[in-house]
């Protein structure tokens, strides 16, 4: 499998989990890799994607991996990600239910104000985390893109060499790729909209043409602030 920009940030996203997280929603789950990492922590995970092929692959991969170390905790708790083919803009999400909601390179496939429904689905103190994409529109955008190019090339070579040492992997359900679409909203536009729709959110750029947006639902511990970041 080639170097994957979204998988690269899984650890960063997992660090955003709120204490005592019990329930999660993964929006645009693809083949379910991040959903499985959540389930491995004993979290009850609902994972949705509009692409039937991706959901089928996610279910098959999960069934294959239930006996591996990655899913030991989930298997012991009798839980696995609950994959569902659905367009999150067309379904009614339970209000105040999820401790954690994740969107990995999926938000730009839907209207940005979909975050309203995702925000409302958060339990008190719950966290919405978006690993988003943006087009290059400003000098700062281009500077980050240029900085990513050599790192991206080195990472791709490292992954290719590692797979060659392991003898490569046969094509399977993990090779399924969800439909892609170019992002429309610039980083600046996203930041402005987020400040309005997600009071108190924090947003920052990442390498590999990504940004991280984190919003915590009020829990009575403090007042929200504005959208920070660079």
Each language-model region and where it sits:
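Conserved class I S-adenosyl-L-methionine
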Residues: 129-158
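Short glycine-dipeptide loop
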Residues: 122-127
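Conserved alpha-helix/loop element of class I SAM-dependent methyltransferases that forms part
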Residues: 4-22
């Amino acid at each position: 499998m080639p170097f994957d920009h979204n998988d690269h940030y899984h650890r960063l996203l997992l660090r955003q989990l709120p204490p005592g997280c019990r329930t999660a929603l993964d929006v645009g789950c693809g083949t379910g890799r991040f959903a499985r990492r959540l389930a491995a922590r004993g979290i009850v995970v609902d994972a949705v994607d509009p692409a039937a092929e991706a959901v089928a692959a996610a279910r098959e991969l999960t069934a294959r991996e239930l006996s591996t170390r990655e899913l030991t905790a989930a298997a012991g708790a009798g839980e696995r990600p609950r994959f569902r083919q659905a367009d999150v803009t067309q379904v009614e999400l339970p209000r105040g239910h999820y401790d954690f909601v994740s969107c990995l390179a999926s938000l730009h496939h839907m209207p940005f104000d979909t975050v309203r429904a995702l925000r409302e689905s958060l339990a008190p103190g719950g966290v919405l985390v978006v690993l988003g994409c943006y087009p290059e529109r400003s000098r700062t955008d281009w500077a980050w893109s240029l900085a990513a190019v050599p790192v991206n090339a080195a990472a791709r070579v490292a992954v290719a060499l590692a797979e060659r040492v392991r003898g490569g992997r046969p094509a399977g359900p993990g090779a399924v790729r969800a439909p892609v679409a170019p992002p429309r909203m610039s980083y600046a536009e996203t930041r402005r909209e987020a400040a309005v729709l997600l009071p108190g959110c924090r947003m920052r750029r990442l390498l590999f043409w990504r940004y991280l947006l984190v919003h915590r639902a009020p829990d009575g511990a403090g007042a929200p602030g504005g959208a920070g970041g660079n």
